[in-house]
Amino acid sequence: MILTINEVLTSSELNKLLDGLSRAPFVDGKTTAGWHAKLVKNTVQLDKNSQEWKKAENIVKTALDRNMLLKMAVLPKRIHSLLFSRYETGMSYGSHVDNGFMGGQEFWRSDVSFTLFLTSPDSYKGGELVIEMTEGERIYKLEAGSMIVYPSSFLHRVETVTDGVRLVVVGWIESLVRDPSEREFLFDLDTVRRSIFTKEGKSLEFDILSKTYANLLRKWGK
C-alpha cells in the first residue's frame, strides 16, 4: 500500500527545520548508501555529527509519533535511520531498492520507507520520486510538510533536479506486521471500525470488528 499523508508537519515545525538545516553542515550522501546504491546516489545529507541533527530528528519524530493515520496504516514498532537529504541542481538518485536491515549492528528491519517533503514543489524543477511497480511507475512530488509511505521492497528513484533545491527527510519503519498485504487488511478493518464507532458508538458491530482486528494483530504481529 502506498499512502500520502498531508500536513504531517506544522508550519512552525517546518520553519524550524528549514532554519536549522540552512545553517548546518552537509556531507556526501554516499556514506549511508548500500554498496550497490552508492553507484547511483548523488546527494548530500545532514552531517549526523552536527548539533543540528538531533534537533531535526526530534522535530520529525515528534510529528510522526502524533500522526494517527501513520499509526493506523503502518503500525510502527520503530522509526529509524532518518536522513535529511538535499538535492541541488544536477543531483539525483538512480533506481535502487532499500536495504532489508539498517541501523548497523542493531539490525532494524526496513518494512516501510517514507519521504517527508520540506520544500515546496514550486521551488524546484525535477526531483520527482518515482516508485517502480509491476503495473507501471507512480510519480510523486508533494507539498512541503507532506509525506509518502510505501513498502521498502519497491524499486524507486529520484529524478534529476534541474533547477532549485529539493530538501526531504527520508527514513524507514520496522512495523509490528511485516507483510504489506496484512498491514493493508488491518488498516481497512481499523478504518471501518472507527467509522462505525463515530456513527453508532460502541455497538455490537464495533465490538465484533474490534475483536477481529485484535485477534489478527495478535496472529500476524511480531
Curated annotation (Swiss-Prot):
One protein family per Pfam: 2OG-FeII_Oxy_3
NCBIfam families: PRK05467.1-3 (NF003974), PRK05467.1-4 (NF003975)
EC id: 1.14.11.-
GO molecular function annotations of the record: 2-oxoglutarate-dependent dioxygenase activity; iron ion binding; L-ascorbic acid binding
One GO process term, biological-process aspect: intracellular iron ion homeostasis
Class of the enzyme per the UniProt entry, highest EC level: oxidoreductase
Binding site for 2-oxoglutarate: R166
Cofactor(s) listed in the protein's UniProt record: Fe(2+); L-ascorbate
HAMAP family: Hydroxyl_YbiX (MF_00657)
Keywords on record: Dioxygenase, Iron, Metal-binding, Oxidoreductase, Vitamin C
Residue span(s) of domain Fe2OG dioxygenase: 78-175
Annotated binding of Fe cation, by residue: H96, D98, H156
Cofactor note as given: Binds 1 Fe(2+) ion per subunit.
Name of this chain's protein: PKHD-type hydroxylase PCC8801_2196
